[in-house]
Amino acid sequence: MTYTLEEFARDCKAALLKDPGPAGREEVRTYVSRACLDEDFRDKHLSDNDAPPRTILYEDPDLKFCICAHFYEGAKESSPHGHGGSWAIYGQAVGQTVMTDWQCVQPASDGKPGLVEKVRDYPLNPGDAHVYNEEDLHSPSRADTTRLIRIEGENLDHVTRVPYKKAKAA
């Protein structure tokens, strides 16, 4: 049975109204996984090869969370980052993303980026979804074209984010 954007948004909102914290986000993660695995959902919302890298599909007027489609062509490695005071859920729909979790070893200060050390790497394959709560630092790496669904706790266009870079190896 097809999972529509309207059903997806309604399920996410109900989960976050019940619990806006980590438990509610974990429930939302299951809906992200469901949408990523739904062929009709992917065909409708994640098949436009001319789409910009990030497209907001839905922004909740009350809770402010966003459902975004991400389109990445070819290989790309992103820098370590967090989502400011917000959170995000990444769901893999097409291709594979290798995620790296990072630990902050020196906070950003005086206009200098924070320094991070690698904690672990793990793949996100189609249907996999992962919650990144406030303060969780991570970076995606793609060897080829990918499509993702990302839930943002609020529209990240309006969130100040601190820059990070890898600490030098001793």
Q: Where are the predicted features?
A:
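N-terminal leader/capping segments at the start of a protein or of a new domain
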Residues: 1-41
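A short glycine-rich, His/Asp/Glu-containing loop-to-beta-strand
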Residues: 48-74
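Short beta-strand His + acidic residue motifs that chelate non-heme Fe in jelly-roll/DSBH
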Residues: 79-81, 99-100, 132, 137-143, ...
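Glycine- and acidic-residue-biased ligand/ion/polar-headgroup-sensing regions
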Residues: 85-103
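Short acidic-glycine-tyrosine-enriched beta hairpin
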Residues: 89, 104-137
